């Protein structure tokens, strides 16, 4: 009977744990939806900004552009912006980003370049601080769905490092959202910007949908609904001055989008991890229930045998 009680207690513990993992999965799923809504809300501004920049590029393509954010100089020091999460329970999300960051730092060392780190997320901060890596700034405790103001604070730090020539290039490592079960740490150069190579944000968005009792992500192409800018648009100010004013906005927008993708990747990883944990808990409950029933049946059989044996002894 003691064995039966132990199995019952373990089944109860696993059921309680499964309730927690299922709740965390549902919360992560809801936040993925919110992340999608925020991406869509910021799209009109991003599209229009890209259109204006393209128009300015066209006008300035035959001119020598001398702007601080476009200045390319010999690279001696690189600032690496590493984006991870503040919490765990999200599978290999944080580990994969940190591993890619270490690989990139080794590549920079092999090229004879110095580096400094700007870190977003407590997990990366804890890892690199314990190992005495050079760190310029740490940002933690950000909203799970990043805001433009938070992206602006980080962009200001990066601009300060670049414009003061403390660093000659700024690179970003974040996790690109692919699907609920797939994400990819990528490296992207943020500074210096290239007026001939500005790219609009990826015209692919993700939508969280349900099919049966399962959640899935569908990526789909989205075209801008904004009217195109006229090719003969007249600017009151010098196009070069306008470009100089818009480039920081473009940097902020690129950084915000990367933070949003990273947040969606973390939430999807957490949702997948909690879903797997719930499935494993359910399978374990089934196995333990079967063991409990077998043990109970064996105990009942043993009691019957003892009763029969006792009856036979009394004859």
From Swiss-Prot:
Q: Which InterPro entries match?
A: ATP_synth_F1_ATPase_gsu (IPR035968), ATP_synth_F1_gsu (IPR000131), ATP_synth_F1_gsu_CS (IPR023632)
Gene Ontology CC annotation, any one: proton-transporting ATP synthase complex
Name its cellular compartments.
Answer: Cellular thylakoid membrane
Q: Which Pfam families does this UniProt record tie to the protein?
A: ATP-synt
What are the UniProt keywords, alphabetically?
ATP synthesis, CF(1), Hydrogen ion transport, Ion transport, Membrane, Thylakoid, Transport
Q: Does the keyword Isomerase apply?
A: no
Supply one GO molecular-function term: proton-transporting ATP synthase activity, rotational mechanism
Q: Does the keyword Cell wall biogenesis/degradation apply?
A: no
Q: What is this entry's stated membrane topology?
A: Peripheral membrane protein
Oligomeric state and interaction partners are given as:
F-type ATPases have 2 components, CF(1) - the catalytic core - and CF(0) - the membrane proton channel. CF(1) has five subunits: alpha(3), beta(3), gamma(1), delta(1), epsilon(1). CF(0) has four main subunits: a(1), b(1), b'(1) and c(9-12).
User: So what family is this one in?
Assistant: Belongs to the ATPase gamma chain family.
Q: What does this protein do?
A: Produces ATP from ADP in the presence of a proton gradient across the membrane. The gamma chain is believed to be important in regulating ATPase activity and the flow of protons through the CF(0) complex. The complex from the organism is particularly stable to disruption and remains functional after 6 hrs at 55 degrees Celsius.
This chain's protein is named ATP synthase gamma chain
């Amino acid at each position: 009977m003691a064995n039966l009680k132990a199995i019952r207690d373990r089944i109860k513990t696993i059921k309680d744990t499964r309730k927690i993992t299922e709740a965390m999965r549902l919360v992560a799923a809801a936040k993925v939806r919110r992340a999608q809504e925020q991406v869509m809300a910021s799209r009109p501004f991003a599209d229009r900004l890209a259109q204006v920049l393209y128009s300015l590029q066209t006008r300035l393509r035959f001119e020598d552009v001398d702007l601080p954010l476009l200045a390319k100089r010999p690279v001696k020091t690189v600032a690496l912006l590493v984006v991870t999460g503040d919490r765990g329970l999200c599978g290999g999300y944080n580990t994969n980003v940190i591993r890619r960051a270490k690989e990139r730092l080794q590549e920079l060392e092999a090229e004879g370049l110095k580096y400094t780190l700007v870190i977003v997320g407590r997990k990366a901060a804890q890892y690199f601080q314990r190992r005495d890596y050079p760190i310029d700034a740490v940002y933690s405790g950000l909203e799970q769905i990043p805001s433009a103001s938070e992206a602006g604070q980080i962009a200001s730090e990066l601009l300060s490092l670049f414009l003061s020539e403390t660093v000659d290039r700024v690179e970003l490592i974040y996790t690109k959202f692919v699907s609920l079960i797939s994400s990819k740490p990528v490296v992207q150069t943020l500074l210096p910007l290239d007026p001939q190579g500005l790219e609009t944000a990826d015209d692919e968005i993700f939508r969280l949908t349900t099919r049966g009792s399962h959640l899935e992500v569908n990526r789909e192409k989205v075209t801008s609904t904004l009217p195109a800018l006229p090719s003969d648009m007249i600017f009151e100010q010098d196009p070069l001055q306008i470009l100089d004013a818009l480039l920081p906005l473009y940097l902020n927008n690129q950084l915000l989008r990367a933070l949003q993708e990273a947040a969606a990747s973390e939430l999807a990883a957490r949702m997948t991890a909690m879903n797997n944990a719930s499935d494993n808990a359910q399978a374990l409950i089934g196995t333990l229930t079967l063991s409990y029933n077998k043990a109970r049946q064996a105990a009942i059989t043993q009691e019957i045998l003892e009763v029969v044996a006792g009856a036979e002894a009394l004859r």
